[in-house]
Swiss-Prot record:
Pfam families named in the record: GHMP_kinases_C, GHMP_kinases_N
Ligand binding (ATP): 82-92
Swiss-Prot/TrEMBL catalytic activity: L-homoserine + ATP = O-phospho-L-homoserine + ADP + H(+)
Main location: cytoplasm
Organism: Clostridium botulinum (strain Kyoto / Type A2)
Family (UniProt): Belongs to the GHMP kinase family. Homoserine kinase subfamily.
InterPro entries associated with the record: GHMP_kinase_C_dom, GHMP_kinase_C_sf, GHMP_kinase_N_dom, GHMP_knse_ATP-bd_CS, Homoserine_kinase, Ribosomal_Su5_D2-typ_SF, Ribsml_uS5_D2-typ_fold_subgr
UniProt KW Phosphoprotein keyword: no
Protein name: Homoserine kinase
NCBIfam families, sorted: PRK01212.1-4, thrB
Compartment(s) where it occurs, according to its Swiss-Prot or TrEMBL record: Cytoplasm
Metabolic or biological pathway, per its Swiss-Prot or TrEMBL entry: Amino-acid biosynthesis; L-threonine biosynthesis; L-threonine from L-aspartate: step 4/5
Key words, A-Z: Amino-acid biosynthesis, ATP-binding, Cytoplasm, Kinase, Nucleotide-binding, Threonine biosynthesis, Transferase
Length: 297
């Protein structure tokens, strides 16, 4: 049996639209074994127990590339990453499927080949890269090749995810974005993306509040998330370092000083006054990324 663990990811990190992402310590686990025949799923809803399951789709892509034909498969999922909340649940399924398939087939593909294959299936290197590699990454796609670099994050920072009880599909969140942008808005984001990376790298955490600002996606998507601005304002009042929409949303991610012991309790009290229910989870950066059979990929 192959066991694969994949972390949740938070993409964009404010201005780094479709390029920055960070892995955090929420995980999906996948247990896969080859059986005599058939396709058996455990741990997911009945509507996902078929060949359209994203994990299986990813596995098949890997098997086809390698030229391996399993006799049958049993796939068990232990999922802790909330679905359609902007925490990389799709990326985790794709990465988990591809890595487990490669392992079953004898580990034919190297890490670079696995990464390119996963991005080809999932389409978002800002989620796939940190899910694979752990930590924070800056990623681009160049002629279908995935190029990335790890971003060093100084000690002394933690994250807090505010996860609502409602979902938001990536497709819907993409649909509200404009077809084109002003030149000045592009410059606005380029500068703040550079500032974000530098501030995290050098431990200049007081600059994060400036770096979190964005003009490419967050304001458009905020309209789909009830109380987004009031929550953001409350987080800022509670001395957060920065607030941003996690991926396409609706999860709101907050950066905090590691020694901050009061934020979670105070923001939870505020969220309880709102109509929707919100879960508050303090998180750390996952530095390992994907782990297969207790070893790093």
């Amino acid at each position: 049996m192959v066991e694969v663990r994949v972390p949740a990811t938070s993409a964009n990190i404010g201005p780094g639209f479709d390029c920055l992402g960070v892995a955090v310590n929420i995980y999906n686990k996948f247990f896969v074994e080859e059986i005599e025949e058939g396709l058996i799923f455990e741990g997911c809803a009945d509507k996902f127990k078929n060949e359209n399951n994203l994990i299986y789709v990813a596995m098949k892509k890997c098997f086809d590339k390698i030229g391996y034909k399993p006799t049958g498969l049993r796939i068990k999922i232990e999922s802790d990453i909330p679905v359609s909340r902007g925490l990389g649940s799709s990326a985790a399924c794709v990465v988990g499927g591809i890595v487990s398939a490669n392992e079953l087939a004898g580990g034919v593909l190297n890490k670079k080949e696995l990464l390119d294959l996963a991005v080809g299936v999932e389409g978002h290197p800002d989620n796939v890269n940190p899910a694979f590699c752990g930590g924070m990454t800056a990623s681009i796609s160049d002629n279908r090749e995935v190029i990335y670099s790890k971003v060093k994050v100084s000690e002394g920072i933690k994250f807090c995810a505010l996860i609502p009880d409602f979902t938001l599909s990536t497709e819907k969140a993409r649909a509200v974005l404009p077809k084109s942008i002003d030149y000045k808005d592009g410059i606005f984001n380029v500068g703040r993306t550079a500032l974000m990376i530098s501030a995290l790298n050098n431990g200049d955490f007081h600059l994060i509040k400036y770096a979190c600002k964005d003009k490419l996606h967050q304001d458009y998507r905020a309209k789909l998330i009830e109380n987004f601005y009031s929550i953001k304002e409350e987080c800022e009042k509670l001395n957060s370092l920065g607030v941003f929409l996690s991926g396409a949303g609706p999860t709101i991610m907050v950066m905090l000083k590691e020694e901050d012991k009061r934020f979670s309790k105070n923001i939870k009290s505020f969220l309880e006054t709102l109509k929707n229910k919100w879960e508050v989870r303090e998180l750390k950066i996952d530095k390992l990324g994907t782990v297969v059979n207790n070893r790093k990929v």
